[in-house]
From Swiss-Prot:
The gene is rsmA. PANTHER family: DIMETHYLADENOSINE TRANSFERASE, DIMETHYLADENOSINE TRANSFERASE-RELATED. It catalyses: adenosine(1518)/adenosine(1519) in 16S rRNA + 4 S-adenosyl-L-methionine = N(6)-dimethyladenosine(1518)/N(6)-dimethyladenosine(1519) in 16S rRNA + 4 S-adenosyl-L-homocysteine + 4 H(+). This is Ribosomal RNA small subunit methyltransferase A. S-adenosyl-L-methionine binds at N13, L15, G39, E59, D87, N108. Its main location: cytoplasm. Keywords: Cytoplasm, Methyltransferase, RNA-binding, rRNA processing, S-adenosyl-L-methionine, Transferase. GO terms for molecular function: 16S rRNA (adenine(1518)-N(6)/adenine(1519)-N(6))-dimethyltransferase activity; RNA binding.
Length: 283
C-alpha cells in the first residue's frame, strides 16, 4: 500500500499490532448478519475481517478510500467488500442509519467522536450488536454497573438497550501514530426488538439522566429536587426503596426508569412537568 500520512482532523491512530487484531476478530459477536466497519484506516482490521465476513465499510477520508480501493480491488469486484465514502455523522438517522437490515459493527473508533457514534448505534434498531475500541476511560463509563464510581448517564443508557462487557485493553504502543492514551475494547449486545424502549421515552430519559447525574457528588434526591417536587420524589423513592442519601451511581437502571415513569404519569395528570417547574433546571 502506498505511503500515507495520518490526519489529525480525523483522529487517525491505526491499530497494526497483529496480536490485538486477532483478539478483536476472536471477540466479534457470533450473529449471522451483515458486518459493518466504521473507519477503515489502512485496512489492517478490514483484511482480517474479510477472512470471515463479507463487509460494508465506511470511510470519511477520500485519500484513504482511493488507496483502499486499490488494495482491496479483488474483494470489491467479487462483492465481498463495499467501501462507502461517507461521514456517517452526517447521515440521517430517522429510519435506517448505516444499513436497511439488521447489522453488527466492528470498529476502532476515533476518540473524539466515539461517544456520539455509540449513542447512535444504541438508538438504531437495525444495529443488533457492536464491538468497538475507544479510549479506556470512555469504555469504562459505557461498561460500568451500579455502584461503580464510573457508573453514569451513559451506563444507564447502555443498560436500557442491552448488555455491555469490557473485553481487553490495548496499549498505546500498538498504534501508529501512537496516541497519548490507553484504549479498551468492549462489546454491547442489544436486547431483542420487543424489549427495546420507545423513542419518546428515550428522549425523556436522556433529559432526565442529565438532571440525575448533574452533580455526581450530591445525592440523587438533591439533584432531582432542583427540578421536581420533593413530595413526589419522596413517594417514588420510598416505592423504589432508595435511600434519601443515595447518589446517582448507586441507583439501578430499572429504578431510573420507574422514577421517570412515575413523574411522567404525574405530568400527564397536570401535576408535574419533566423539563420545567417553578424552579429552574440546572444549567
Amino acid at each position: 500500500m502506498e505511503e500515507y500520512r495520518s490526519k489529525k482532523r480525523f483522529g487517525q491512530n491505526f491499530l497494526q499490532d497483529s496480536h490485538f487484531l486477532h483478539k478483536i476478530i476472536q471477540s466479534i459477536p457470533d450473529i449471522p448478519i451483515q458486518c459493518i466497519e466504521i473507519g477503515v484506516g489502512l485496512g489492517d482490521l478490514t483484511q482480517e475481517l474479510l477472512k470471515i465476513e463479507s463487509l460494508i465499510a465506511y470511510e470519511v477520508d477520500l485519500d484513504l478510500c482511493s488507496l483502499l480501493n486499490k488494495k482491496f480491488s479483488n474483494q470489491i469486484q467479487s462483492g465481498r467488500l463495499n467501501i462507502i465514502y461517507k461521514d456517517i455523522l452526517n447521515l440521517p438517522s430517522q429510519q435506517a442509519w448505516l444499513h436497511t437490515h439488521e447489522y453488527k459493527v466492528v470498529s476502532n473508533l476515533p476518540y473524539y467522536i466515539a461517544t456520539h457514534i455509540i449513542l447512535r448505534l444504541l438508538r438504531d434498531r437495525f444495529c443488533r450488536a457492536f464491538l468497538v475500541m475507544t479510549q479506556k476511560e470512555v469504555a469504562q463509563k459505557f461498561c460500568a454497573t451500579t455502584g461503580q464510581k464510573e457508573f453514569c448517564a451513559l451506563s444507564v443508557l447502555v443498560e436500557s438497550f442491552g448488555k455491555a462487557k469490557m473485553l481487553f485493553e490495548v496499549p498505546k504502543e500498538a498504534f501508529s501514530p501512537m496516541p497519548k492514551v490507553t484504549s479498551s475494547v468492549f462489546v454491547i449486545h442489544k436486547y431483542s426488538q420487543q424489549n427495546q424502549i420507545e423513542d419518546s421515552f428515550l428522549c425523556d430519559l436522556e433529559s432526565f439522566l442529565k438532571i440525575a447525574f448533574y452533580a455526581p457528588r450530591k445525592t440523587l434526591f438533591k439533584n432531582l429536587s432542583q427540578v421536581f417536587d420533593k413530595k413526589l420524589l419522596e413517594e417514588v423513592f420510598e416505592n423504589e426503596n432508595i435511600k434519601s442519601n443515595a447518589r446517582a451511581h448507586e441507583v439501578k437502571t430499572k429504578s431510573f426508569h420507574h422514577i421517570l415513569q412515575f413523574l411522567k404519569k404525574r405530568n400527564d395528570n397536570g401535576k408535574q412537568t419533566l423539563t420545567r417547574t417553578t424552579k429552574q433546571r440546572p444549567s
